[in-house]
Each structure stands twice: as C-alpha cells, then as structure tokens.
C-alpha cells in the first residue's frame, strides 16, 4: 500500500519502487487512480476534469540510482533505473567534485506532471547533483505539477544539491518536496532558487500556487523542516515587506556538516561588506541563508563567492557556466 505521508516514507527509497511499480503496472484506471491518489487532495481527485487529466497525464519521470566509489576509487553509478522524461548522467571532473546531472527531456512541468528522483550516495563520496537546465513551471489548469526528490547521504560524504533555477510562469502551480537523509558524519550543501517571472521579458505572475517543502533528517531523526507556500496573485504578494520586499527572485541555501560554526562566522564577516540582501543563522545544526534579488546574475555571483568559503569540499557545477 502507498501511504499518504510522502515525507515520512521518502526516507526509504523502496517507497519509490512501490509507487512506480504500481503506477506502471496498472491495467485499469482504478489501479492508476489508487496509485497516484497520495499526491493529490480528495477535492482534486473528485473533479471530473481532473480525473481526465490524470488519465491523460503528460509526463511521468522517474530516476532511481546509487552513486559510490568502485574498487579503484572512481565514482560511478550503481543500480541505475530511469523512466519517462527524466534521465541522469554522471560527469567526471579531474579537479572538482564529480557531477550527477538530472535531465528533464520534457522541457518543464505543467498540470498533472510528476517527477520523482531517488538518489543514494555511498560513504566517502563527493558529488554535485544538478540539472541540465532551468526548470520551467508552465501554466496549469487544475492539477499542480509535482516534483519529489529524495537524497540519502552516506557517512563522511560531501554532497551538494544545486539545480539550476526554477522559473515560475503565470498560472504555474507546483508542489515540490526535497527530502535529505543524512548519517552522523554526512556533509550536505543545498541550493534552491525560484524566479517569479522574468523581468527582462516583462513577465508577471498574476496567478499561481507554490507548495514547497524541505526536510532534513539525520540518523532518521528530523533535523530541519522548511515550508514555503504562496497562492493567488503572486506578483502582488511579493511586494509585501514580509514576503520578498518587491524582489522576484528568492534563493534558499542550507548546509549541515563539519566546521559549521567556522563557516557561519566567515559568512557573517562576508555579509558586512556584501552588496547582497541576505540573512544567515544556525538552527539545530543547520546553517540557513535566504537571499533576495531582482537579477539572477546577483544570485549566481553570491553563490560563487559563498562556495569559496567552504573550500574544495563544494563547488558550483561546471554546467552552470554553459
């Protein structure tokens, strides 16, 4: 059976196998409906037009893999499985961390789409996980677009989650979940950036919905939870001082691992002379940063300066420069 609480079950990658097996082996619509039901509210499931969207779902992507070192010390992929519009490729770097690139061949997400990533990183492994291009959230009819990612990090590993930015178009609806499962000596650096309409293109988001959640576990205990929700006229709401102060770009950075207090002091020292608007603090062993901007180049420049503080353990993905 598929349980309703994704964030609890997502710590076990078998959940993804159960879900996908149910979804792809369904021989009747009732089987299909039962498999996908945990990701939608009862109200959504009862709408006839939404039921039609479920039957005619545009994209269902799935990546499930394990990354670790071979006997000769080279990072490689084990147990690689992918379906639908999602692909994963490992790029080796000689002087930087190797990169696992998630590719969405559909070119974005829209109503009813569902993307699932389940990635396990073995102990003593350094890895950058990123995406090939910016994710685009297109206009949705009734159902939300869905993106779920589960990352398990082994002991003494350095793993970063640095996808390219997510662009939110007018009418976009997104439910996104990022679940991180750490061991005692795991090190994790995560970045998520949202762009509400491209100002250079004159785009505004007059209607939309975002339901975004990050949860970090260590040794199966909840360490940090962050939920961001906004609905309605997003362009109007982001003008409020307690929301985005008129900025349309919002970036969240988290780090948990070794030398966290040292990094915090260096970041706060950097903040004194920085031109960027951001805040930093440590909550329950997790270093948090929130950055606001109107130009994506400011965010990227900031992140470029930020990763230098962490030394050789983390670096910006090379694909960001293409």
Where are these regions (language model features)?
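N-terminal, charged/glycine-rich beta-strand/loop interface patches
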Residues: 2-155, 159-165, 170, 308, ...
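A structural signal for small-residue-enriched, beta-sheet-centric alpha/beta enzyme cores
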Residues: 19-27, 31-33, 194, 198-322
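N-terminal intrinsically disordered, cationic/polar leader segments
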Residues: 45, 52, 56-62, 66-83, ...
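Short acidic, gly/pro-rich beta-turn/loop elements at beta-sheet edges
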Residues: 75, 129, 139, 171, ...
